[in-house]
Amino acid sequence: PLLAIETIEKLTKKIKSVLPLGCKYNADMVTNGYKLTRRVAEKLKDMDIHYIQVTLDGSKQAHDSRRILHNHQPTFEHILDNIRECADILNISIRINVDKTNINEATEIFDWLERYGLKGRVGYYLAPVDDINGVCNNHICMERPQYAKEEIAFIKEGIKRALCTKVLSRAIMVYVEQLA
């Protein structure tokens, strides 16, 4: 959506102009984060878009092999630079897309969060790659029980490193503590 920031601005103004008196507007956005500069983050905040979900496809290696620019340049570190620059302006969560081929590297995100000074500044969580429209190769999609086991291990590692996510519920925290 950030390729069309002017359209977002126009739509936001239009929506706000027709709101009934006393109604407030706010919005969330999902983006790959590549165009999420500080200037863009300030514009989004001014438009009452305060929460941004940035998607990464697993570890740096997995992400950069899947999400490259047309000139074959990697994007992972550029996206983390952008998140670092914007984390004090917007509420940002990183969704880490995982499947059988990259799940074993998922905890590498913790090293990157620490390296980029993002510990405690952003949320993060795993999301399984699902075969919702027949596009995913079924051999790489995880079954729910396998994903659940991997997600619990991921959460436990985050807790161990004191990188508890902003989006962890208290119920999950208690459950994970009981498993430890």
What are these regions (language model features)?
Residues 65-84, 88-179:
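Radical SAM enzyme [4Fe-4S]-AdoMet core and its adjacent flexible, acidic
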Residues 2-51, 55-62, 69-78, 96-108:
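Canonical radical SAM enzyme core domain
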